[in-house]
Amino acid sequence: MRFPQPSPDLRVRWCSAYLKIDVCAAVLRNDERFRNIRTLILSGERGEESKQRAQYAIFEPDRADLRNGMKFKRHIDRFRPLRDWKEQQIWDLLEKYRVRPHPCYFMGFGRCSCKFCIFGNCHQFASAACVSRQQADRLIAFEKDFGYTLKRDTDLASLISKGVPYETITAELASIATSFEYSQPIIIPNNEKWKLPAGAFRKCGGPM
């Protein structure tokens, strides 16, 4: 076995395909609720995130679309309203409507993605290991079992040792972020000040 590879090619970066993209497509294709109706999928990619995402269409038929089907029709469009937005606009919108950012941003992460994302840099991995040491150790053990490393140029233990965990990580934030239940209000109450999280505008390893 091998880990998914940091590549635009979804055949080798299989985590994005099998665990995210194909899961949604499978539901749309197999659930009869989506037959003979019109469905709009809202997708949050921004062109600022990568060159490939900058080329995505803002509006197009979804990969699960079957609007010209013979037995039944499945009319599904995909809309990317944020494709041309800048990160500043996103934070401004969250502040305007008092939306609470995900706790990972308050810990210092610049992206809310998989905790040990294959695109992560040494500081991201060191921070993730700080939050979830047992999971990090399990990935390190997988490298030894597979005979292949997650990163092409280094092993995970060395990568983590080179990084510096974000100083804004706290036990409370780590507990909130890793809990199976989330009880904080999504909309911040009026008696609480909205705060820009430490991870805002932080450059991190991200999508290709």
Segments predicted by a language model, with ranges:
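Nucleotide-activated chemistry modules centered on ATP-dependent adenylation/adenylyltransferase
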Residues: M1-M208
